[in-house]
Curated annotation (Swiss-Prot):
Function field: Plays multiple essential roles during mitosis. Phosphorylates the N-terminal domain of cdc25, which leads to cyclin b-cdc2 activation and mitotic entry. Also required for organization of bipolar spindles, and for exit from mitosis. Phosphorylates tpx2.
Any one GO MF annotation of this record: ATP binding
Protein name (record): Serine/threonine-protein kinase PLK1
Positions of the catalytic residues: 167
Region (Linker): 487-501
Chain spans, region Important for interaction with phosphorylated proteins: 532-534
Region called Disordered, residue ranges: 1-26, 336-360
Gene Ontology cellular component terms for the protein in this record: centrosome; cytoplasm; kinetochore; midbody; nucleus; spindle
Segments forming domain POLO box: 404-482, 504-586
Organism phylogeny: Eukaryota, Metazoa, Chordata, Craniata, Vertebrata
Originating organism: Xenopus tropicalis
Keywords: ATP-binding, Cell cycle, Cell division, Cytoplasm, Cytoskeleton, Kinase, Mitosis, Nucleotide-binding, Nucleus, Phosphoprotein, Repeat, Serine/threonine-protein kinase, Transferase
Length: 598
């Protein structure tokens, strides 16, 4: 039997099945609601489904005594019948339980019953850099430094403990509520037993595979440096360096070292990427060299980032005075995809922050074309008419939206539409197509002109011209606070901070049966009047969240709805959504209120 530090993983063959044949999905037992560690007698309540990957399903689990919340990775033993499967799981647990570092996912124990192995891990509520990448594409340079520095510190710790991760990628770099990076998923990790050992085998296919692994020449710590190079490239450029639509072609490019860094990338960043992506492993920098590179030593690294960065770029205060003027350019915030540069208004006090427009990467229609295509595909297969519907298989909690509208009030006959986002910030889209947002601290303000230029101020200091709008904003805020029930807002977002920027309401309209709201980060929300159900569509995650009559919140990948089907109620709302997105698309960009009667 495989052992983990003196403890056996006991896996018995299923009744009526010879050893080594995993059970079919229908024979997999139900995961219990209360998980009991037989050794410590600790009891955990299984809560929200967090996602699945490989053999495992992940749930939020709560220690019933301490009320601490963890992530529970649950693996059916029917998936661990073959010796290599068992050994892989044993190695993963043995490595992870030996680690303890701020930037490595915390290990809090493991146990088993007759049907499952349970691994108790630190909960990272903000998912991973993969979801951030899907929503944001390229991030700002200070953000890239922030995420990379923490990844490097975590990897430095691994290497000092003779552990090679071997699968560093965006999806394995998790984020907690404080937006701190935690390296996770040690399924492909290995321990170096002696100096100079070169590993020859690697089960599975890492995302950012190094050329020496492809060449089966033997590999060591340098594979993690290669992966960090790929991660850095992806964060700054918005796509991986060797990515093609064909795996064979991608591997060919890796072997030939065929990639190019776009000209707009900072030369210091380009130089560091090129060092990490050298074909010869011994020519790459070591993990200890990386943070001494000038990309990190001469560039601004924020001490923390707001959770708003998960979906919109932050705003950066002008960098500390010790930093060279030429390095200040990438530090200002951005509102990508708009026609006009973001400039500081002369009429606004000097406290406001200077804004700058980077290269636009977002489409002018804020991803409505992509959303229309996604809805057309899902509706074409008639997902509610499948012989067998397994809607729960289409669930993807990692795609939960960061922001949605939790309250709204229509005063457009006089002033505009007031709304509250799920983080308790409040905005008004005025009839003159300007927007004003008050952050959840009740003090910070974001003002967006008709041409989409942004200004930042606060309720204590603002130009006289905004007095009426700020008074109206406060009126809307008080009205919604006193009279309206909050929609689906049981997910508690973290306090914003001085770098936060919020998405704003771009366009809206009402029909006889619903209100349609389009946010500047691409999200489209439809609230149905009759039954108070809601759908929230995200084109970047290609996902839909459905808040049903019971106010239960579920998020599904549209491609998985195509595959597994969905209930009639959701299918009819997706059909309606397609018509509404067409209407949004046909309206003029920047028009605050679209006339609609459907």
């Amino acid at each position: 039997m495989a052992q983990v530090a003196g403890k056996k993983l006991t896996v018995a063959p299923e009744a009526g099945k010879p050893p080594g044949i995993p059970g079919s999905s229908s024979s997999v037992k139900e995961i219990p609601e209360i998980l009991v560690d037989p050794r410590t007698r600790r009891r955990y309540l299984r809560g929200r489904f967090l996602g699945k990957g490989g053999f495992a399903k992940c749930y939020e689990i709560t220690d019933l005594e301490s009320r601490e919340v963890f992530a529970g990775k649950i693996v059916p033993k029917t998936m661990l019948l073959k010796p290599h499967q068992k050994d892989k799981m044993t190695m993963e647990i043995a490595i992870q339980r030996s680690l303890d570092h701020r930037h490595v996912v915390g290990f809090h124990g493991f146990f088993e019953d007759n049907d499952f192995v349970y691994v108790v891990l630190e909960l990272c509520r903000r998912r991973s850099l993969l979801e951030l990448h899907k929503r944001r594409k390229a991030v700002t340079e200070p953000e890239a430094r922030y995420y990379l520095k923490q990844t490097i510190l975590g990897c430095q710790y691994l290497h000092s403990n003779r552990v090679i991760h071997r699968d560093l990628k965006l999806g394995n770099l998790f984020l907690n509520d404080e937006m701190e990076v935690k390296i996770g998923d040690f399924g492909l990790a290995t321990k170096v037993e002696y100096d100079g050992e070169r590993k020859k085998t690697l089960c599975g296919t890492p995302n950012y595979i190094a050329p020496e692994v492809l060449g089966k020449k033997g590999h060591s710590f340098e594979v993690d440096i290669w992966s960090i190079g790929c991660i850095m490239y992806t964060l700054l450029v918005g796509k991986p360096p060797f990515e093609t639509s064909c795996l064979k072609e991608t591997y060919m490019r890796i072997k030939k070292n065929e990639y190019s860094v776009p000209k707009h990338i900072n030369p210091m960043a380009t130089a560091l990427i090129q060092k990490m992506l050298r074909s010869e492993p011994t020519s790459r920098p070591t993990i200890d060299d990386l943070l001494n590179d000038e990309f990190f030593t001469t560039g601004y690294i924020p001490s923390r980032l707001p959770t708003t960065c998960l979906t919109v770029p932050p705003r950066f205060s002008i960098a500390p005075s010790t930093i060279d003027q030429s390095l200040r350019k990438p530090l200002t915030a951005i509102n990508k995809g708009q026609d006009s540069p973001l400039v500081e208004k002369q009429s606004v006090p000097a406290k406001e922050e200077e804004m700058q427009q980077p290269e636009s990467t977002e489409p002018a229609d804020c991803y409505l074309s992509e959303m229309l295509q996604q809805l057309t595909c899902v509706n074409a297969v008639k997902p509610s008419e499948r012989a067998v519907i397994r809607q729960e298989e289409a669930e993807d909690p990692a795609s939960v939206p960061i922001f949605w509208v939790s309250k709204w009030v229509d005063y457009s006959d006089k002033y505009g539409l007031g709304y509250q986002l799920c983080d308790n910030s409040v905005g008004v889209l005025f009839n003159d197509s300007t927007r004003l947002i008050m952050y959840n601290d009740g003090d910070s303000l974001q003002y967006i002109e008709r041409n989409n230029s942004e200004s930042y101020l606060n309720v204590r200091s603002y130009p006289a011209a905004l007095t009426k709008k700020i008074t109206l904003l406060k009126y809307f805020r008080n009205y919604m606070s006193e009279h309206l029930l909050k929609a689906g807002a049981n997910i508690t977002p973290r306090e914003g901070d001085e770098l936060a920027r919020l998405p704003f309401l771009r366009t809206w309209f009402r029909t006889r049966s619903a209100i349609i709201l389009h946010l500047s980060n691409g999200t489209v929300q439809i609230n149905f009047f009759q039954d108070h159900t809601k759908i929230i569509l995200c084109p970047l995650m290609a996902a839909v969240s459905y808040i049903d009559e019971k106010r239960e919140f579920h998020t599904y990948k549209l491609s998985l709805i195509q595959e597994f089907g969905c209930c009639k109620e959701l299918a009819s709302r997706l059909r309606y959504a397609r018509t509404m997105v067409e209407k949004l698309q046909s309206s003029k960009s920047g028009v605050a209120h679209v006339k609609a009667s459907a």
